[in-house]
Amino acid sequence: MAHQERTFIAIKPDGVQRGLVGDIVKRFEQKGFRLVAMKFLRASEDLLKEHYIDLKDRPFYPGLVKYMHSGPVVAMVWEGLNVVKTGRMMLGETNPADSKPGTIRGDFCIQVGRNIIHGSDSVKSAEKEISLWFKPEELVDYKSCAFDWIYE
């Protein structure tokens, strides 16, 4: 069995407010990825500042933190073969205008400042983000009954 990796996916306040949570979760499930953790929360400013620490010197950073704090988010951990890379492909480009139809951003959003979803950009980032948003005991380990139908 090939190596299973994990990624962090967060549905942003605009995705929650627009009622897109179910559609997004469905896409990851239909692809064959396994949900390991999920929580619905209003993220604290401290958590968001730490999450986006790499962007702190960018001019849009304060607005990004304010926007992410403006409403609830759905934080998730997904697991599967190449889930980081494949998950990013499923999301589409950061700027929805550059996203292809069939991707989450290509289908559901218009502007970069309201692009409805975040996904880890590397395995290393995923590990950092997962540990920031979830305690180890919140990650549920189980074997999906569909596992043998998805993986050789």
Curated annotation (Swiss-Prot):
The keyword Transcription regulation applies. Belongs to the NDK family. Its main location: cytoplasm. Ubiquitous. Hexamer of two different chains: A and B (A6, A5B, A4B2, A3B3, A2B4, AB5, B6). Interacts with CAPN8. Interacts with AKAP13. Interacts with ITGB1BP1 (via C-terminal domain region). Interacts with BCL2L10. Its EC number is 2.7.4.6, 2.7.13.3. GO terms for cellular component: cell periphery; cytoplasm; lamellipodium; nucleus; ruffle. It catalyses: a 2'-deoxyribonucleoside 5'-diphosphate + ATP = a 2'-deoxyribonucleoside 5'-triphosphate + ADP; a ribonucleoside 5'-diphosphate + ATP = a ribonucleoside 5'-triphosphate + ADP; ATP + protein L-histidine = ADP + protein N-phospho-L-histidine. This is Nucleoside diphosphate kinase B. Keywords: ATP-binding, Cell projection, Cytoplasm, DNA-binding, Kinase, Magnesium, Metal-binding, Nucleotide metabolism, Nucleotide-binding, Nucleus, Transcription, Transcription regulation, Transferase. PANTHER family: NUCLEOSIDE DIPHOSPHATE KINASE (PTHR11349). The active site is at residue 118.
